[in-house]
Each structure stands twice: as structure tokens, then as C-alpha cells.
Amino acid sequence: MNSPLQILHLEDDPADAALIQSALEAGGITSATTRVQNQAAFVAALERGGFDLVLSDYTLPAFDGLSAIALVRARWPDLPVILVSGTVGEDFAIESLKSGATDYVLKSRLTRLAPAVRRAMREVAERVERKRLEAQFIEAQKMEVIGQLAAGVAHDF
């Protein structure tokens, strides 16, 4: 990853935020991170846009990771969201993925964070390329139909 990833990080604990930033750096992820601590700041940052990735704690005062995912999906459906949680059970993992999380990482296993970020960014790039190719294919089909119509009209004269 050449240019720094623009990361929106929803985390209320400064110590956890520092550990997560260190894990990204140790994993070779260069980032420009905007850290917010509550729903209002999160919504304001989302509205400004320009982020490549969202990292979100699951449990925050008066706000949670699933609500954060819903806010992201409403405005930026293709923006990857990785939940980073201190505690996670199987039910949480399933619920978060069904809600639209790209991945989840335990705070006790932050060595998984950089690979999860790389995978999420690779999936975004693949999705963008697939959409580009689909648009190209549709355009080619339109041109083929126009060519057939033009040939039919020319034949009639």
C-alpha cells in the first residue's frame, strides 16, 4: 500500500487506540487516522467522507459497533468496516458479519489486524475492478445492438 490509508477509527479508549495504531504500523500499514470517540463525532466524520476504511470498537458508551456499521452502510455501502473488540463470542461474530462488517479482530489478537486490513482493501479494489468491467461489458453490448440495428437499417435501403 503506497499512499497512507485514510482510516476513521471509532474508539473511546486512548490506550486501545494507541495499541491499534501500533499494530497497524507493525504490520506495515501506513495510515492517516482520524479517531473519534462518540456517535456525533463519528457521524460528522462520515459526512465529511474521504475514508478508505473504518475501524470500530464494539462497545462504546451509548453507542455500539453494530450501530456504527448501520450508519456506514446507509451512506457508504462499499466502505469496509472492521470491528475491533475486547471480547467477542461466536454470536457477536455472526451478528456483526450479517450486519455488514467486513471482518472483526480481537484486541487480544491485534497481529490479525494488518492482514484483515489488507484483505479488506484488496476486496474493495476487486469490487471496483469488477464494476468497471461490468460497465465496459454493458457498453460493448449496447454498441453491438446499435451495430446490428444499423446493419439492419442499411440492408433495408
Language-model features: locations:
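Hydrophobic face of the DHp
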Residues: 153-157
